[in-house]
């Protein structure tokens, strides 16, 4: 970049830019934000705007691109969405009054994790995450700058850190330590995160209170430092730090939440078709965010769950009051984000009107809640602060037709300020005064076409044509001479003009000052507004769950301490909603105290995965306090859910289906307790048949003997059904089918015992494969099944080697040890999956000769 012969203005740009090398610098110049050098070239491509140059005739013209200041936000949004940072440099003085170069300073750095304003507002949270590491444990803090939410926890390993970042759907992660190359690859390439770095811990500890570990303190402190450094102002809306423990909620990895379609449908990445979509009858943006949080973090405290259930039950029992409550909540705006705009000094008159309208609704909401006459609802009533004095201030101060900007005037109501009312009267009546003067002078002078005009240069003046110059009165004084006319003024006109101009200027300045004063007063209420926002959000979510429960005929689940699962006629709530109640086939699920594992067999498309997901969603809904889709439900409280459902390869990281399966299985067996729920669908299918079967059996035995978690294990390995004879806590179930005249009907009902067939060829028929191909598959299947019936299955001990006495009493399949070894080696070398039937028969013949 050539920097010779740089103008003072460009030198100012370069001086500012060197402090923000990792950000696009928007440099305010008049009505535009300009970008220069590499920023201009890159922004022109990304934003699809014109690229020009400064000093075009110079030897080294400077690349330049710009966007209008009034539409800059939409361009900033694009850059942020692409993962970049933007530094905004404003003019800090009036260019007309500046001596030399206009003073400019960066007033804000906008990053993917610190977005407050957006041309496309979204009700979802936007979390900035900070992670620190002390060599043993990780501290993780997160904040939504747009709402003020601020939380911290500590985690044992990087896998947990990754999962929590994914759960928060963060776009930017702030690091206080050096990552390994593998960890950096995971965060940047796999998770598409912007990584930022901060070494300084924020000194003001007013927001950080409570018993925290050192690594939690440093993570939270560095997060605060980064936010203050980028926002460059005191942020009064930031809430006191909340410490949380992962174990205080039902633990689920991001992969588990994705496979269960909790907040978005995994196939479409849209809200539709998710549990969030099903349960969302909220009326406010705050309620939507809280509902998502409840789905993300179901409770493990029975007392807290029952408290939510009780309020939902009260709402269910009072249809009219609940309907009134829902309608009143429709008038509630996003208090959290309005408060943050006040804190950032960005709240406009429309924002305050929305806040005032919300506060006007609060007394009605409070009265409706009181009408339920319920002690559990009264707790919510007691938490509602109506802030009547703030509502009165906004109602009496801000005009209901006020514009969205603070520079256009017409913001403050008439009657709020006497001086402003006087100035407005002068401006309003001044026009009449001028008309009176015009009529009076026209009559006195005899100039019939005499009129008063106005322009910025001459102000108000009498317009006199050349033919009437002889009639001009003596008290007129000349202001300007034109070709065919002259302009005159009078002392009286000048006096009125002075009063009107003063009123216009003073009115605009005074109205701005009054608005700023009102906004400052609103800021003093932010803490109370945030508490009100939390309560209204809770009310909104609870009424939403009541509406959903009534609409879909859900029931109130019960909880037990005896480790039993009883679900009568349960339904997969989301599938039922999509299909319709009439088409959905319910299933009961039962685990007694002695049963820990259900081994489920049956064909694809028959409903095994839906059955497993049904149980998971029922548990999640129950533990978030919701009613559930069933005729009767009695559950233990689970501490975690582990799943492997679905076969999506991790293509970005190069991990195959089988590797992902094994990693998720490892997480489950290492982290699960006897209070956990494990759901494995076709584990082991990603490798060779016997490898997969062996691993599946070993995992089942490990869960049975060492973990004790309630487990549903779906499999195509029918040989595994024999495990029920030696694993006392395992039972076989299968998906029922109906065969008639060669056709197979999947009943989507779970029945006791193992499945007798896989019906894979029937599934292929449904998929539309050619008839000749299906006929050939039937022929091959019959031959393979005939061979299979002539083959003995050898049971392998699962725990420890048998004693020598046991070995002595055990009959040997191959009396001759040498022949045994030869046969074993021959068997190990066989590639069963690639053998023709003829080759299989020949091999079998050769093996028989060795006996």
From Swiss-Prot:
A molecular function (GO) term: ATP binding
Sequence positions that bind ATP: 602-609
Pfam families: MutS_I (PF01624), MutS_II (PF05188), MutS_III (PF05192), MutS_IV (PF05190), MutS_V (PF00488)
SUPFAM superfamilies tied to this protein: DNA repair protein MutS, domain I, DNA repair protein MutS, domain II, DNA repair protein MutS, domain III, P-loop containing nucleoside triphosphate hydrolases
Known role: This protein is involved in the repair of mismatches in DNA. It is possible that it carries out the mismatch recognition step. This protein has a weak ATPase activity.
NCBIfam families for this protein: mutS1, PRK05399.1
Cited PANTHER family: DNA MISMATCH REPAIR PROTEIN MSH1, MITOCHONDRIAL (PTHR11361:SF34), DNA MISMATCH REPAIR PROTEIN MUTS FAMILY MEMBER (PTHR11361)
Protein name: DNA mismatch repair protein MutS
Organism: Streptococcus pyogenes serotype M18 (strain MGAS8232)
Gene that this polypeptide is encoded by: mutS
